[in-house]
Amino acid sequence: MNALAPLGMVSDLPSSNQVSDGTAVSKDYFVVKDGVKFAGTHLLVDLWGAHNLCDPDMIDRTLREAAETAGATILHSHFHHFSPNGGVSGVVVLAESHISIHTWPERDFAAVDIFMCGACDPYKSLPVLKAAFRPSSINLGEQRRGLIV
């Protein structure tokens, strides 16, 4: 039995690095950008003065749309709604990595991580987040993960 089955994180579809007979195909998903090779781009997105931070279903839809807009393949998502403040923590697991969020509605703040490898462009997710959460300001950081030196 697959170890992820109890968590509901098993896909019936072969991943993009498998052929239909179950034989793994070796493919390098590292990114080459500006002559530098690395695993993927990890964006750290702080949304201040943000709205819509208490609805896990809306946040799930938003992060799924952000992933699809970036060209990612969604495998699974899970969100938790906290009380009494109504904050939400959740993740959309991608074949190319993940998008996660933690919200603090009492501070009008959300912390979003977008980590993607391969041909996905995590920057394409940002307009989706801006439209859904309407932040008054955004702090954005980028980290190239798995940098080959």
Set out the residue ranges of the language-model regions.
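Polybasic/polar functional segments that serve as interface/processing modules
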Residues: M1-V149
